């Protein structure tokens, strides 16, 4: 008998003032997998991610994470981390302060914060940049700070919304490899939104093809 999926979206729907956001979204995600939601702008992939994150609540359907019904749970109660297209860094804080900000909010002891930060900076290749502000970093370095912040959160589920779209083509290829290696090394489950077919095909174990607010096809890169 196979293990239960780590994440389940069961017939989820979202509408705004009667307008369709997503409809009939049903998806099982295995623990430790890398799942890409792929499709053009407006297809519902970011809405699906926001529903999973708890940033929006569905009008219909259920959402489960680790077997727990989180359909109406706040984002802070879903045990996940997020990496955004905009990086969402605090410009007045240093790299180190940005990385451990969430840990400070959660009142994690200082020694533990420092240990987790050192490990995250090592993994993301940011050692030596601890005191720099985001404005002093390249786009690729800023994205690595956002990744380091997700790593120190220590969550087993990480949601990524078009995290590479602000980078140039050469950097995208480099950071793409970094993200995939991190996911494998840490054994985390990643749900990754992108409109870039190459990105999805090169990173994901499973691709969810979306159009007009609905899932069109689900399969491995080879199957699609």
Region annotations inferred by a language model:
Residues 38-40:
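The feature captures the beta-strand-to-loop junction immediately N-terminal to the Walker
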Residues 93-101:
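Short coil-to-helix segment of the ABC ATPase nucleotide-binding domain corresponding to the Q-loop/switch region
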Residues 69, 100, 104, 111-129, ...:
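Conserved ABC ATPase "signature" region
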Residues 218-219:
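ABC ATPase "signature
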Residues 152-156:
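A short, proline-enriched helix->beta-strand linker immediately N-terminal to the Walker B motif
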Residues 133-137, 141-143:
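Conserved ABC ATPase signature
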């Amino acid at each position: 008998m196979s293990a239960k999926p780590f994440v389940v979206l069961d017939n989820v729907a979202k509408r705004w003032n009667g307008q369709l956001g997503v409809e009939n979204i049903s998806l099982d995600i295995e623990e430790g997998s890398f799942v890409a939601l792929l499709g053009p702008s407006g297809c519902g992939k970011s809405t699906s991610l926001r529903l999973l994150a708890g940033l929006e609540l569905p009008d219909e359907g259920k959402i489960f994470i680790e077997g727990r019904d989180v359909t109406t749970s706040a984002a802070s109660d879903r045990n996940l981390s997020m990496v955004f297209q905009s990086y969402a860094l605090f410009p007045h804080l240093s790299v180190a302060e940005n990385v451990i900000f969430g840990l400070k909010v959660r009142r994690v002891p200082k020694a533990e914060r420092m240990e987790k930060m050192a490990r995250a900076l090592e993994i993301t290749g940011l050692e030596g940049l601890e005191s720099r502000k985001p404005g002093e970093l390249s786009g690729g370095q800023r994205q690595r700070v956002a990744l380091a912040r997700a790593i120190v959160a220590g969550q087993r589920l990480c949601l990524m919304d078009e995290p590479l779209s602000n980078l140039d083509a050469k950097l995208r290829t480099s950071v793409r490899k970094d993200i995939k290696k991190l996911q494998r090394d840490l054994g985390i489950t990643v749900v990754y939104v992108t409109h870039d077919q190459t990105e999805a095909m090169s990173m994901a174990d499973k691709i969810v093809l979306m159009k007009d607010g609905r899932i069109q096809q689900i399969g491995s890169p080879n199957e699609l």
